[in-house]
Amino acid sequence: MHTKIKYVLLTLLIICFGTSQAQRYYLLDNKPATDWMTEAYPIGNGRIGAMIFAGVNQEHIQFNENSLWTGDEQETGAYQAFGDLFVRFDSDVNKSFTAYSRKLNLDKGLHEIAYQQDGQQINRRYFASQPDQVMVFEYANSKKGKLNAQIALQDAHGQAVQVEDGHLWFQGTLDNGMRYAAQVRVQVVGGSLSKTTDEKGQAVLNVKSADRIVLLLSAATDYANTRATKWKSAEEPMKVNERYLQQAEKYGVNKLLARHVADYTALFNLVELDLDHSQLDSKQTTKALLEAYKKQPIPALEALVYQYGRYLLISSSRKGGLPANLQGLWNNSNNPPWRSDYHSNINVQMNYWPAEVANLRESAWPYLDYINSMREVKKINTQKEFPGVRGWTVKTENNIFGGESFLWNTPGSAWYAQALWEHYAFNRDEKYLREFAYPILKEISEFWDDRLVRRPDGTVVAPKGWSPEHGPTEDAVSYDHQIIYDLFNNYIQASTILKLDDDYRKHITALRDALLKPKIGTWGQLQEWETDRDDPQDKHRHVSHLFGLYPGNQFSVLKTPELAKAARVTLTARGDESTGWSMAWKVAFWARLQDGNHAYKILTNFINLVGGDDID
């Protein structure tokens, strides 16, 4: 499936890791954004986020809060847009502006705008604070008393906006009963602030003759990530917003920024990557860099792509919140592609492949907590489809209430479980393993213990599997077997470390060893199905039967050279060109095959795709 470019960049974190001195870690443009996906810059604190257009005469900020979902435990629904903020400046639209620059500083989590117009220097700053749970937008002119603006708020679901006491706010209720609210507080230095209506008759705030404007935005719902309270928080969204905004107002913009930068850099600065920073001109726009890259690869730009991926994961996934979805947390539609959901057949897992290796283990926690919180609903749904089994699994499309749709992705929960083990493998926290991860690893292993079928010859196979979005439904699909193998391996290791359930560990070990082994076909390929039907002309984007190469470790060049050779044949036949996320997966495949040149070739192809005019 296709996906948004921000999601694809999240996946590219798997390719590199290193340390260095400070580098050029920013995106740069010399004109305002006009397109949401390809030009606006994202900010986020893991819960709320925005896309900044940075227009000169009119500012447009489209914002989100990642729990605003339709649907419930039965219906999947979709992730929703939250609202839009407009700041219309009182300036002649025909007046030219010069020295325009908009910069997304990845090393600070700070978006900055600067330009000159009518003899004035205009500066803006934007950031999303995790410690204070607000977004902050600051507007300043070099000439005092010259800042005039109209500030308008808009609900993506059409509720009326209220204005009072220097605040704009709206609140509403979705069809599923979810309550939501957003509020903007306007702080004016110098000048005056008044309520009025715009040309459409909507309530707005007018700022006259100000030196500086600071906008504080908070958005919230009454969602809670626990089934025990029926997914509801006891605190009303309006009260949540008021609590955050009142505290933020006490700090002031400079202290808010200092607190934000300290929090953000504590994560971002854990990794630096030095690929010859001297190659980059500090004034060269990102688009110009991408155009230059088409002619000659620029390693420093590759480092920038890597750090942009880390920025996006930090901005869309923080402890205590929901995981990054198909679009991170940025979404401007109430009917987004694929619901902007949690796809269990690679996409949500791929979002988190980088979390541990890119030294962002704190950003892994939303995904781990999500897996845990969905268990009870998934057990109910699983019993309806697979009566009598223990444990649980998932369908392909998933929401934040346990609701799901499309086809069953039967090994999906086992793939989820890999992240539980990886978090232990990187951090060696036995308390976490014992109390959090192990019970989930065991119950998913129990699902497959009950689900697997033993043939007369003793071989064990997974029944009625489907290689994602490709081919027939039948027994012994390679995708199923490789993920089950990975699950059982991780369970066995966890049980051994904790010295728990010795007899059951022996049982699972025997079951793992009896699984149908990977098969090599007539043209030397690794078979996608037990039947040798692979087509050497097939260029399908999913390469699910290579899970055991990456992110699994069932086969490798050193351990299983024949299977590694067959994987190489399969990859060569599938080709290098594909959707962005598929290309990122292929980078990892070729790296595991110890072919760095081929991995690098696909990486350069991907970056050239990013730099194209038609980005999907």
Question: What are these model-predicted stretches?
Answer:
Residues 347, 409-423, 429, 433-450, ...:
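Extended, hydrophobic alpha-helical segments in both membrane/secreted and soluble proteins
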Residues 462-494:
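C-terminal, helix-dominated tail/subdomain
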Residues 23-405, 417, 422-424, 442-445, ...:
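Aromatic-residue-lined binding/catalytic grooves and analogous aromatic/hydrophobic interfacial grooves
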Residues 599-611:
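Substrate-recognition/cap regions that form aromatic- and gly/pro-loop-enriched pockets
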Residues 1-23:
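Bacterial Sec-dependent N-terminal signal peptides
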